Amino acid sequence: INEALKRDLGKSNFESYMCEVGLVLSELTYMIRHTPSYAKEKTVLTPIAQFASRSYKKPSPYGVVLVMSPWNYPFLLTIDPLVDAIAAGNTVVLKPSAYSPNTNRVIESIIDECFDPHYVAVVNGGRAENTSLLNEHFDYIFFTGSQHVGREVMAKASAHLTPVTLELGGKSPCIVEKSANLKLAARRIVFGKYLNCGQTCVAPDYIYCDKEIKDELIRQIQKQIKKQFGSTPLNNKNYGKIINEKHFTRIHNLIDPNKVVCGGDSNPGTLQIAPTVMDHVTFQDAVMQEEIFGPVLPVLTYDSLDEA
C-alpha cells in the first residue's frame, strides 16, 4: 500500500499511515465494535392514531451500492465507504479513479482475496466505465470528487430516483480574524494546506484575513513552511507530488510570478510544485476562478468581518 501511494502521489510512509492506512484501520475497528448495536431494532414512540400498537425502527440495507472514489486519498476514500456499506449489509461495486493506478491494483488485489465478486467487485477504467456504471440502476451511489462530475452523477441517479451522497470540492476560505493567534493559525494553515501537496478537499483554498494582520500572517506562514518542509521543499523526500502532468500544468498556470511572495518553484520532471504563497490577489485573478487543489495559497483581505 505504501509503495503504491508513493508512486501515485509521492506520499511518505508516515503520511500514508497518518492520512490513509491508519484511518482505515480506525474505521474498521469502529464498525466491528458498533455494527451489532447499529443493526438492532430500536423501539420508538407510537403516534396516538396507532394506539395499542408498537412502533420500532428496523435498519435495513439499501441493496447494491456504487462507490466512486477519488485519486487524492485513493486508499482511504475507497476503503472507508466500502467498510460502512458492508457494515450496513449492502453489496458494493467499487469504481476507483483512473488517476491512481498503482493504488487501484493493490485495492483490487485485496478485494479479490477477501470477497466473492458477487458481494464486492472492483471496476477499473476511465470516463467510459464511469458512464457505463452510471447508466445502471444502483440502490445507492456514494461519490467523492469534483462538482462537474458530481452534477453528472446526480443527473444519472435522478433517472432511477437513486439516493446519493456527494462529497464535492469547492473554494473554501480560511478566515483569519485580527484577534487570532497568528503563530498558531499559520502552523495549522500550513499543515492543512500543503499536506498531500494541497490535493485535499478540505484544505483551505485561500486565506481571507483582516487587512491589519495580513503582513504578519504571511511572515508567520513563511516561517512555518520553512519549519515544516525545510528551505528547499522540492528536495524534501517527504514532500509529495502532483497526481499527473495535466493537473501539474493546470496548477502551474494559476501562479502569477509577480504576486508570489514565497515558493513558486517547480520541477516538471517530478511533477512537484513548492509550497507557494501569493499576495495582492483579487477575486478576478485566475487563481480565484476555480478550486486550486494544489500547493498554492492566495491571500486576500477584508476591512471588516461583516464584509467577509
Question: How would you label these PLM feature ranges?
Answer:
Residues I1-Y56:
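N-terminal Rossmann-like NAD(P)+-binding subdomain of aldehyde/semialdehyde dehydrogenases
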Residues L23, Y99, A128, N181, ...:
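Residue-level recognition of oxygen-bearing side chains
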Residues L28, G89, V120, I141, ...:
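Residue-level signal for inorganic ion chemistry
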Residues K57, I243-K246, L297-L300:
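Glycosyltransferase donor-binding loop in the core domain
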Residues H148-F283, S304-D306:
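ALDH superfamily catalytic-core signature
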